Amino acid sequence: MIYQGKAITVKPLEGGIVELNFDLKGESVNKFNRLTLSELRAAVDAIKADAAVKGVIVTSGKDVFIVGADITEFVDNFQLPDEELMAGNLEANKIFSDFEDLDVPTVAAINGIALGGGLEMCLAADFRVMSATAKVGLPEVKLGIYPGFGGTVRLPRLIGCDNAVEWIASGKENKAEDALKVGAVDAVVAPEQLQAAALDLAKRAVAGELDHKARRQPKLEKLKLNAIEQMMAFETAKGFVAGQAGPNYPAPVEAIKSIQKAANFGRDKALEVEAAGFVKLAKTSVAQSLIGLFLNDQELKKKAKKYDEVAKDVKLAAVLGAGIMGGGIAYQSALKGTPILMKDIREEGIQMGLNEAAKLLGKRVEKGRLTPAKMAEALNGIRPTMSYGDFGNVDIVVEAVVENPKVKQAVLAEVEGAVKEDAIIASNTSTISISLLAQALKRPENFCGMHFFNPVHMMPLVEVIRGEKTGETAIATTVAYAKKMGKSPIVVNDCPGFLVNRVLFPYFGGFAKLLGFGVDFVRIDKVMEKFGWPMGPAYLSDVVGIDTGHHGRDVMAEGFPDRMAVEGKTAVDVMYEANRLGQKNGKGFYAYETDKRGKPKKVTDPQAYEVLKPIVVEQREVTDEDIVNFMMIPLCLETVRCLEDGIVETAAEADMGLIYGIGFPPFRGGALRYIDSIGVAEFVALADKYAELGALYHPTAKLREMAKNGQKFFG
């Protein structure tokens, strides 16, 4: 053994070739943490010092190669002073460069996935062999940063600027055949042949059949583009990528700038350019928010995994109420391998549900994400029915009938009599109390909420709602089923609106106040979209449905009268009375026309302004900053209350619920991280400036205490 550590070993194979193997003890995947980097330093030094070594193959002892850097270390590292962070980055890069500069040929054998630092390790090798089932990529832009272990330097010199920009700016994972096509790898082989192929390549290089130094040289030199070619390549790319990424996500454009700035330098000077840009991005609030979001997501997955021990296996599911929502649930279940009964009392409802599922599956086939055979298999997994005849074998039933407590209670009581005693029954209600609905059931311990968001196939969140009498098995089984469907479940305790809608309606309350002061809803939408929301509140109201919003507002007002009750008519009332229900009937805040692709396109409608005139109580001048504060303060304060009331257990769950459920701007990290970014004391002072607007703008006593003590929600 040439070197043995806790993450890396180097052992001799044959003919002077050694294997540098990554296998981080106690972890399911390999990652570049402090330990792995320090051991890589020691391993490279050991190889360099051993005159008997003639070649190196780099392998993984895990099912994946290396998933990248240890993101949990970013939080502390990125707090370091700029000079210290840059020095640490350059020190790490020196390890990769020293590996690249070894006198002997090096071959990386890529299995599973090689992402971020994992791919950058491979780029430092002379040759790369890839398993046919493996994927490679540089996803750092999704964390608000860019590759920091030489990715912006080596990749463009290896596969050309255009390809490198596409890989780095998109952050996508690339299949083996695509990597081979652009020259990122030298060979693709069957998984079982990977080790042998890498060894064979190393032997050929040792024998002089392949010139490893010639292969290495372009990575050490400046980019092979003249000044005009550089200008054409980089300026075009920056314009296109900036348009794709938008102004709130600077990393993709910064990556291109870094490649451009380093184009005329050799490797070592180019790495300094990369490090300077990396440090600049690491210090942005966007990077802090997106890294926080990633860590929150990991926390969510860990919490959901804990339920696996108690959960019952769901072999057969059922959905009550077909239509668009029921069809979406049936599609998602069948697509992910759980057959499902889809029941409705109307033939046309069943047809609508089947059409929805077939349409969604068809789109996946069109995009090449599903084979026709798999589509047929999924469709066969949806069994339409108008009776409870086959419900005796069902493990979980999702009720998705009309949002009316009496109707739901009747249907729930009916289905309870048709299923086996230990079957779980879940209601896809968006606002109705689970404890109230449970009153109709004989086995309330087997009942919980399972709130999907529309459209089901696109929205990742599922709220799993615990009622007063809900048992742990019901929660665990529903969480496990949601995960099996490819969703991100969050367990919340029962209250009007649960987490997401409870937080969303105060946001709409701020919107109502702005409209009452005569502020143009088109302007409000533009300001909130600029803030980072996928759509403004007027457009969102139209998409959700004015009638749905009207009903939800009434439920919330009844549940929280101290701050959500309304005096007099609001915009949603007059729109509802004028039968302007939004996209569903072609008119709401906006009017809707059908575009060339058959999709609704919003246009301004003078009639909407006429309808809104009676609700304007006074004309008030407001700035764009006021608009953001009117909207965001109530949303953030209600999120704080949900955490304080124990509706959610953790700040991470609260923030992820908003990002996954209503499209809260990811680069802002969630409502609680947004408060942290402003500063808790500063946020409380800001809210107090708007105190005259009512209780929605009044911070809680506990938040004031946090402000006084200099506390934060994260870190």
Curated annotation (Swiss-Prot):
In this chain, NAD(+) is annotated as bound at M325, D344, V401, V402, E403, K408, S430, N454
Q: Which superkingdom, per the lineage?
A: Bacteria
Quickly give the catalysed reaction: a (3S)-3-hydroxyacyl-CoA + NAD(+) = a 3-oxoacyl-CoA + NADH + H(+); a (3S)-3-hydroxyacyl-CoA = a (2E)-enoyl-CoA + H2O; a 4-saturated-(3S)-3-hydroxyacyl-CoA = a (3E)-enoyl-CoA + H2O; (3S)-3-hydroxybutanoyl-CoA = (3R)-3-hydroxybutanoyl-CoA
| UniProt keyword Oxidoreductase, yes or no | yes
Q: Does the keyword Lipid metabolism apply?
A: yes
State the EC number(s).
Answer: 4.2.1.17, 5.1.2.3, 5.3.3.8, 1.1.1.35
Name the residues annotated as catalytic in the UniProt entry: H451
Gene Ontology cellular-component terms listed = fatty acid beta-oxidation multienzyme complex
* Important for catalytic activity (site feature) positions: E120, E140
Which stretches does the entry tag as region Enoyl-CoA hydratase/isomerase? 1-190
Instruction: Show the segment(s) annotated as 3-hydroxyacyl-CoA dehydrogenase.
Output: 312-715
Give the metabolic or biological pathway.
Lipid metabolism; fatty acid beta-oxidation
Annotated GO biological processes are: fatty acid beta-oxidation
- Which molecular-function annotations from GO does this UniProt entry contain? 3-hydroxybutyryl-CoA epimerase activity; delta(3)-delta(2)-enoyl-CoA isomerase activity; enoyl-CoA hydratase activity; long-chain-3-hydroxyacyl-CoA dehydrogenase activity; NAD+ binding
Subunit (UniProt): Heterotetramer of two alpha chains (FadB) and two beta chains (FadA).
Annotated family: In the N-terminal section; belongs to the enoyl-CoA hydratase/isomerase family. In the C-terminal section; belongs to the 3-hydroxyacyl-CoA dehydrogenase family.
Relate the protein's function as given in its record.
Involved in the aerobic and anaerobic degradation of long-chain fatty acids via beta-oxidation cycle. Catalyzes the formation of 3-oxoacyl-CoA from enoyl-CoA via L-3-hydroxyacyl-CoA. It can also use D-3-hydroxyacyl-CoA and cis-3-enoyl-CoA as substrate.
PANTHER family cross-referenced by the UniProt entry = TRIFUNCTIONAL ENZYME SUBUNIT ALPHA (PTHR43612), TRIFUNCTIONAL ENZYME SUBUNIT ALPHA, MITOCHONDRIAL (PTHR43612:SF3)
* Protein name (Swiss-Prot/TrEMBL): Fatty acid oxidation complex subunit alpha
Source organism of this protein record: Pseudomonas paraeruginosa (strain DSM 24068 / PA7)
The gene name on file is: fadB
